[in-house]
Design a protein with these regions (language model features):
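Conserved, structured core segments of small domains
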Residues: 1-95
Length: 95
C-alpha cells in the first residue's frame, strides 16, 4: 500500500524544539529508505514541510511510522492513498 504524506509545520510553531525536530528528519529517513518503507522524499518549495511516499503493509504500519517521526507533534498531515495507474485496466472510450 502506497501513501503520499504531506506534512506542514505552522510558522507560528517554529521554535528551538521544532527546528531540532526538523533537523533530525534526514537521519530519521535513512533507515526508512533503506528498508523500502519510504520510497520518495521531497521538499515542498515555499512551504515548511515535505512530501514523503510510504510503501507499507497496512494503515496501522503507516500510523506507527508517522508517530515515530521527529516532527509528528509539530506538524499537520494530509494522507493520500495511491494507486498504481500502470496496472489498471484501460476502459475503451465511450461512443
Amino acid at each position: 500500500m502506497k501513501f503520499l504524506v504531506i506534512w506542514k509545520i505552522e510558522i507560528g510553531r517554529l521554535s528551538g524544539d521544532v527546528l531540532k525536530a526538523v533537523l533530525r528528519m534526514r537521519d530519521h529517513a535513512v533507515p526508512l529508505e533503506q528498508s523500502g518503507k519510504v520510497i520518495g522524499r521531497y521538499h515542498i518549495v515555499g512551504s515548511h514541510g515535505g512530501a514523503w511516499i510510504y510503501d507499507v503493509a497496512s494503515n496501522d504500519e503507516l500510523e506507527m511510522l508517522l508517530a515515530q517521526s521527529p516532527v509528528y507533534n509539530f506538524s499537520h498531515y494530509q494522507v493520500y492513498p495511491l494507486a498504481d495507474m500502470t496496472s489498471l485496466p484501460v476502459a475503451p472510450p465511450a461512443e
